[in-house]
């Protein structure tokens, strides 16, 4: 873990051409639920449109990395490290020249857990772009040309809360391995308690808060949300619901839902399940090509821009640097 962290800090300290002379900024894309389909051509029009627009954004604005927020391969994950879906749904789709040297940092969703998550982890040794070192892990970065630091905690919310059957039950019922769930939560608590970074993000597949089809994840509202508040986390990033949402609680924690990489769902059926005033933005138009979130972190603030795959900017918000204790 320490070596992994060190390499990331070194990588993002390099000056990229589009960063010279501008405000020092760490830039990345967050996209979830982009995982194509299990039959030919193994991708959807929305996934292709998102890939093309992400390529354009990276070429024009730059990105140090891409966060994959789970459900990387619909509907049943992959079976082995040599599964053709890696090529057909990932490599051949996110193929723009601007994306060839941009690393992906990956976590698993509920559909990935139907297959072999260990194979997705092992694929890190095959692809120069795909980075998935373990089911849950920490990323640490520095904003280029500064000492301003960023930590991202990548979670496996399926092992934390259990799998969910999209067709039978909208809530994960219980983790399959209670000991592994406890280990992951203890790991997160320990690291958040010690986190000194200027920005701290947590990412997982299931949402804490959502007004859409799946609604708030009860397990995360109980176990994770209090930690986000207690330790001054900047934002929680997720997917699972197939739309774009931004919510913010009374403590200033942001909730960035970016699950529109492959499907779009207009549902707002859980609007009354979210506390009044939390929802700031929701977009799930059925005729949309989907979209993603683009994040820029400067020494002063973090900006989240929701972008449609058509190229339209939908919503923008800002979150401040963490207050020092």
Swiss-Prot record:
Signal peptide: 1-21
Compartments (UniProt record): Lysosome
Keywords of the record: Disulfide bond, Glycoprotein, Hydrolase, Iron, Lysosome, Signal
Sugar attachment sites: 116, 147
Co-factor note (free text): Binds 2 iron ions.
Highest taxon, organism lineage: Eukaryota
Name used for this protein in its record: Tartrate-resistant acid phosphatase type 5
Reactions catalysed: a phosphate monoester + H2O = an alcohol + phosphate
Cofactor(s) demanded: Fe cation
Primary residence: other
Database matches in InterPro entries: Acid_PPase, Calcineurin-like_PHP_ApaH, Metallo-depent_PP-like, Metallophosphoesterase_PAP
GO MF annotations, alphabetized: acid phosphatase activity; ferric iron binding; ferrous iron binding
GO biological-process terms attached to the record: bone resorption
A Pfam family matched in the record: Metallophos
Complex formation: Exists either as monomer or, after proteolytic processing, as a dimer of two chains linked by disulfide bond(s).
Origin species: Oryctolagus cuniculus (Rabbit)
GO (cellular component) term, any one: lysosome
EC number(s) from the headed UniProt entry: 3.1.3.2
